[in-house]
């Protein structure tokens, strides 16, 4: 029940805190280096397949949101950063999103140009528009994207429509760039 769940969560938190007590991240123009327990892992921006950034409200009101940033590389490896073991994860994730935007956007644009569908969690995009599961909404009807209260929302025909939990939508920064470009072209 609830007690067992809390015990498992507490155990996992202790494990992660111990594992990441010496965690260091260095950001460079072409990627970053993650050092854990003396082992370096180099992650190039062009090797990243997805970035997911979630801000969760802490149970401790004064502390503010807790950030979790997850990178997945094209070889399937995942790397996570959280405020529990690293300072300023929100700023780190912003730098990661800035570094990965161009390579990810180029890959998505090539796939769209080839007529493919590209998924972003619970939604997908095509060259014609956004597919929310009930047909394609043309790009000209999609005005903006935002994250609020842990939800991703699109402005469609002037009204905000929730499309999914932020934790389920990878590469929001790429989706945001696609929406902005569609608005500029429309």
What are these regions (language model features)?
Residues 50-114, 140-186:
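Acidic, Ser/Thr- and proline-rich intrinsically disordered linker/docking segments
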């Amino acid at each position: 029940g609830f007690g067992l769940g809390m015990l498992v969560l507490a155990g996992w938190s202790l494990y992660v805190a111990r594992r990441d007590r010496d965690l260091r991240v260095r950001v460079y123009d072409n990627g970053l280096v993650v050092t854990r327990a003396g082992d370096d892992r180099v992650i190039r921006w062009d090797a990243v397949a997805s970035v997911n950034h979630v801000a969760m409200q802490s149970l401790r009101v004064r502390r503010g949101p807790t950030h979790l940033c997850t990178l997945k590389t094209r070889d399937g490896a995942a790397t996570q950063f959280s405020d529990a073991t690293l300072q300023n994860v929100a700023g780190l994730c912003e730098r990661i999103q800035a570094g990965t935007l161009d390579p990810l956007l180029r890959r998505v644009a090539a796939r769209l140009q080839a007529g493919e569908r590209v998924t972003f969690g619970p939604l997908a995009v095509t060259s014609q528009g956004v597919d929310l599961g009930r047909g394609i909404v043309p790009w000209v009807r999609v005005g903006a994207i935002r994250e609020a209260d842990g939800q991703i929302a699109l402005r469609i025909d002037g009204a905000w429509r929730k499309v999914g939990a932020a934790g389920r939508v990878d590469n929001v920064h790429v989706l945001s760039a696609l929406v902005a470009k569609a608005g500029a072209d429309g």
